[in-house]
Amino acid sequence: GTKTHWRPDLEVFTDIKIENEYFEDVLKKQAVVNPNITFILRIQRENNSFEEKTFYYENGIADYVAEIAGEKPLTSVQFFTGDRKGRDREDKDDYKVKLSVAFTFSNQVKCLEYYHNSSFLEHGGSPEDAVKSAFTSQINAYLKSNNKYLKNEKPITFQDIEDCLVLVSSSFSTQTSYANQTKKAITNKFIKECMTEFLKHNLETVSYTHLRAHET
């Protein structure tokens, strides 16, 4: 493997005291989106001994969703993955996209996390828009087709759904458009469109027994 040693220049980095929790959070997120890879954090104490923590998710986001949901999720964890190719505009070149989504429902916890090219998207962007559109559309269609709505009842909204949804998505693309320089949201039109189609298709074909288990 590769070993990298780096010492910050104190003239540039005037404050180099970074809490251990920051490194733990970063490595955990990397383990989540890089399945079957072990990340080890070693923190040197004042007595020169080392405190060591290991981060590992054999099945990546699927195991992470199961961890968040705990022992009593309302449904089993669903995992979808696929590849797409397209472009954001007619005058642009095609690029490749790899999509992975894991989710379950819970009445104990809710969580929505989006990652792209191994980076956590704090503000979501295209993947978040796709999840909102696809889940609202498909669950609404299921409720209508099975006569689950009461007379004059308003259609379900994503706010209703997210209250019991535990979902993590991880996507990769050969071209990425970020909302701004902080890179906490992506704006690729094609990623939004293909991920919406990808989710709708998989939600439509997945066994509806999982959704029935969510009904109360």
Regions found by a protein language model. Give the residues of each.
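GHKL (Bergerat-fold) ATPase N-terminal catalytic module, capturing the glycine-rich phosphate-binding loop
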Residues: G1-R7, F13
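Conserved small/polar residues in nucleotide/adenosyl-binding loops
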Residues: T209-T216
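Short, polar/charged loop or turn motifs at beta-strand boundaries
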Residues: L10-I16, F120-L121
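P-loop/Walker A nucleotide phosphate-binding surfaces of NTP-dependent enzymes
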Residues: W6-R7, I18, L41-R42
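Short, exposed interaction patches on small structured surface elements
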Residues: Q181-T196
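GHKL/Histidine-kinase-like ATPase module
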Residues: E21, K28-Q30, N36-K183
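Long, non-coiled-coil amphipathic alpha-helical linker/lever segments
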Residues: K192-Y208
